Amino acid sequence: MHHQQRLRANGGRGGTGLGAGSGPVSGGHSPLCAHCRGQLLPHPEEPIVMALGQQWHCDCFRCSVCEGHLHNWYFEREGLLYCREDYYGRFGDACQQCMAVITGPVMVAGEHKFHPECFCCTACGSFIGEGESYALVERSKLYCGQCYGKRSCQPADAKARITTAGKPMHSIRLVEIPKDATPGLRVDGVALDDGCPTVRITDLFCNFFLWLTSMAEQCCGAPYRIDVNLTNLHIGDRILEVNGTPVSDSSVEQIDKLIRSNEKMLQLTVEHDPVQVCRSCSQADIQRAMSASTLILPLSTSASSVEVGRERLYKTPGEQGTKARKLRQATNASTTIPPAAGATAMTQLKEKERCSSLSKLLDEQHQAQQHSAHPQLYDLSRTQSCRVVQKPQRIFRATDLVIGEKLGEGFFGKVFKVTHRQSGEVMVLKELHRADEEAQRNFIKEVAVLRLLDHRHVLKFIGVLYKDKKLHMVTEYVAGGCLKELIHDPAQVLPWPQRVRLARDIACGMSYLHSMNIIHRDLNSMNCLVREDRSVIVADFGLARSVDAPRLPSGNMTPGGYGSGANSDAPMSPSGTLRRSKSRQRRQRYTVVGNPYWMAPEMMKGLKYDEKVDVFSFGIMLCEIIGRVEADPDFMPRNSDFSLNQQEFREKFCAQCPEPFVKVAFVCCDLNPDMRPCFETLHVWLQRLADDLAADRVPPERLLHEIETFQEWYASSEDALSPTSQRSLNNLDELVKSAVDSEISPVEKEKENMVIKPQDIPKSPHLGKDFSPSGERLRDSMRARRRQRFLGAQEERRNLTPDTESKERALKKALKKCRPFGERGYLVDLRAGAELQLEDVRDLNTYSDVDSSCDTSLNYHDVNNLPAAQEDENTVKPGKEELLEESTNKPSNQESQHHRLAIDDMRTRLNQCRSKFEHLEEASRRNFNQSQHSMKNFFKTPPVALKMFQRLEHEAAALNGGNNCPPPPPRTQRINQTPIFGRKNPPVAIVGQKLQHAESLEDLASSGVAKQLATPAPKRSKATATTKGGQSSNPPLFLPPSLNISVALNSNGNVTTTTNTNSSCPPSASDWLPKKHKLTLPLPSAQQQRTSSNHRLPMCNNKGKTLKPLPSRTGSQGIPASNCVSPTRSSRPGSPTKHLAQRHTAATAQRLTNAAATHQQQHQQQSSKTTRLNILSPEKVHRLGARLTDQKQKMREEAAATASSVGGAGCAAGTAAGSLNGHRTIGSSGTPNSAVGERRRRAAPSPPVRTHFNTRC
């Protein structure tokens, strides 16, 4: 803190007059000095200084740095005393209250500065705003005007004052004076020999206030009194400011005129009692100062100008203090030393103090505190004397600057040209007119960045201005305008050497920025300013960002800034894998900011980026300078991937441009950020090119070769292709052929023209993650980028050349080192048994990719284990290589330490990856439980629509049952965290196939109508048997009722038939049986179906009964044999053995079902066609359901049309059918044995719907 000292000048009064808190000497104990801890003995020639509530010897009250006596000004910080020069030179502009360095707005009280939030009243705690009255007492206690007035009214004994002769305490106050009182104000100025002018208040002004006080007492009485202290003015007070304007360099006439011309309330900043007399000063200075009206002394006096020839009258009880103090105390302690010996000792004392250059600031505690606040300070104090400490940034007030013309206006603020009122310096004021939080944050960030920079090609920061409760920035003034105006001004002639120098200056400034770990992120031609000498500076750091990870120093870097291509082991880690590049160690996912015309592709796509985005912006600026064209894609040719169209740009704008300059622009605009050079390298290239062009020399081929081959050197020293790059094999033309040829072995030369198989290209070890753990979909997954690179490689391989094949081989070798273990993947195969199986996959690109929006919640086992032999090969070979490397190259201690650090870094990264994988596994485990239950429910309860196609499946299986074809290979689909089951197409629908309707009343009218099917269906009863007829290919037909067919078995085993008329055929059993009876019908095997189709007897029954006539409309259509049943099912038996017959029928049906199942199993083993229905996708189920609905609708329409056309014929046929005795069927037998078996079968009960049908008729 800063305080004002108080000195004892009362001579021989000894211990009287001590400050508050110290008290007089009592009880025989003398007080101790706060510095040397010596006794303060009462002596008339030994003054005692009282300050900060403590006492010092006058000789001990010195600056801790320069050892100068402190007379009227002193500063205290952390228990050490400083003079004003040393304090400001060491700590800069520090806040009076919190002792922190001020970097923003500032509140000034005299020469003491505060943060706005620290400028508050000590008594009430209220904040003191600009223009409000205040008082700074003892340079340490700040009061508002109201609290200071109350404190002044207190009794004198209640005031905590450090005083010597009853003088008031030192104070700096801001007072307000009414306009009517200004005519009585008189000022007087005195200039001493040191050139420090002062302006003080004369007694006329105070006499006026005394008169005003007396008049107020007479008019208003005793309760109302105007005290002079309340106005905060005293005789001899020093005026510091008038209405906020400093008066240090103003004359008395100017100040008097300013006071008289005031139309409002007059505000004065005054300093009360600023000077006290020090006994240690020379008498000549005192006499000269007393001759003037006021006394002004230098703020500090050096030790050489102070007379210290007197003897000290105290001894140091302890060993505290510096060596000089101990020597002085030991010399002055003895009073019996002769005068000659005393003079010799005093000379030695002075020499000892002169050689003591190490100050007390070098203790460990002080160093730690100082370096925490100022990290740029050096550890050794002796080196600080050799450094040139630059002048700290200034803090301006509104009255210091004169606003001039407006230079420009942007989205966040305005820019004005201002002139300093005193020095006449021309500067630029950037005002912020937006009050939102984002604008304030960006503005403060720009100020924080600029104040740390100091370079000739970077905009110079001068200071800040706090006006109207807003922060404004003051920078240097650049008269040339921005670079864009110079480029597009046709009146300006820009030769090629001048253009190269423009680019060189920008590269130099950006190289300095990147060395300070700052990314500009908004580099364009509008943010680069041109001086009058055509030099360029980089400006506008509102979007700049500090990089967290510092760049690692490169051990094998050439002066040009790139690695040596000969050292191929530099980028290898101890484990034999490629390290990550330095740029990718710094790469993070920052905000997308800047101008899109100059924005880098990785920033445009929202990927991770680093300082290389500034290199791409610089490349676009080089294209602007070369072609003097705007960066708008309408004028500058660009590609769809935001890169530069180099071929078109060269044809349009590079006719006369030097080739190295064009190459530099192209390499800066590379799509891969790792292939762009740093600004240090660019500055070296452009400097060499500028020197050659200035001397009218042709640029050497070596420079052009370095620029063209830079990418190979950079790739060999850092890393392979960046994962953020979208480049494929067609963009590898930049690789150097010499480096590739040097690594080709004889075995590889034999395989020169071999095409790389897809499974030979190693992939990323990460599974394609399209979703984050929180469920958000990623913008650009690794799987999509890998697929895109693979497709580009497939297209490129169609037209391979030896050149590209050699590059592919180099790429393969580099990728093999990066990803030696390939990528893990799974295949899902749904076989006939409906078992989910996973197969090992080493290459996922040969299979079709799936939609990334599928559910990723299914968990599966890890079955990607390599065979034992292959694993042995993969493990043994690296072991041999490691043994060879260890035997040939013995690493040194330094290399082993470097490898150890790399391993520790790798271990840390692996731990981070493991924690991420654990979170992903936990999330997938939770989702797996839900998906597992849903999958089980799906397999247990298939959709209802699947049951509708059960008969369709059996009919299709029966149709293809006779064809013995080999089983097709299992169909597999690629998955990546998502199972896809092998889907098989359903049985091919037969043309003209018609499915039966469910039983309903509207279908009863057409229940007797014939239905046509392309394939015969199995019969539903044991009582029916078929025999071979003359026309086996024609389907059986229902005959008219007048036709009776009787079947008899002769002695030769042949079947004889007798046809009679007046016989009717009942409808098919599948037409009138209920749904529950249909499901119990047996399913015959394919062999039985072939037998029944070969032995088919139409138009007859085995009882010799006549069949029911068929309507004329459908008489020509074929009816399958399954629609004709035995006559035992045509009518309900009336005998009491009805229940027994039904049970016999059920048992027979069960026997046939078992036999059919056995035949079906044998047939399934022999046949290659499975009869099990595959799991259909929802899309196929929907299509089959729609087809079923259409077929039902068509059947309803045909049934309605048939019923309307037949009319009464159907009713007559029904009446005739009801009069029969009910034992009619169409009988057929192929052999005598089958005929005998048919005789033993009993008839099924007649359908119950016949009586209801007859009733309706």
UniProtKB/Swiss-Prot annotation:
It catalyses: L-seryl-[protein] + ATP = O-phospho-L-seryl-[protein] + ADP + H(+); L-threonyl-[protein] + ATP = O-phospho-L-threonyl-[protein] + ADP + H(+). Signal peptide: none annotated. It is an enzyme of class 2 (transferase). Residues 31-93, 94-154 form the LIM zinc-binding domain. ATP binds at L407, G408, E409, G410, F411, F412, G413, K414, V415, K430. Phosphorylated on serine and/or threonine residues by ROCK1. Phosphorylated by PAK4 resulting in increased LIMK1 ability to phosphorylate cofilin. May be dephosphorylated and inactivated by SSH1. Residues 794-811 have a biased composition (Basic and acidic residues). Residues 401-686 form the Protein kinase domain. Expressed throughout the imaginal disks of the eye, leg and wing. Residues 1126-1137, 1145-1166 have a biased composition (Low complexity). GO terms for biological process: actin cytoskeleton organization; imaginal disc morphogenesis. One of its GO terms (molecular function) is protein serine/threonine kinase activity. Pfam families: LIM (PF00412), PDZ (PF00595), PK_Tyr_Ser-Thr (PF07714). The keyword Metal-binding applies. Transmembrane segments: none annotated. Residues 11-24 have a biased composition (Gly residues). Its main location: cytoplasm. It is found in: Cytoplasm; Cleavage furrow; Midbody. Belongs to the protein kinase superfamily. TKL Ser/Thr protein kinase family. Protein kinase which regulates actin filament dynamics. Phosphorylates and inactivates the actin binding/depolymerizing factor tsr/cofilin, thereby stabilizing the actin cytoskeleton. Modulation of actin cytoskeleton dynamics may be essential for imaginal disk morphogenesis and axon guidance. Interacts with LATS1, and this interaction inhibits phosphorylation of tsr/cofilin. This is LIM domain kinase 1.
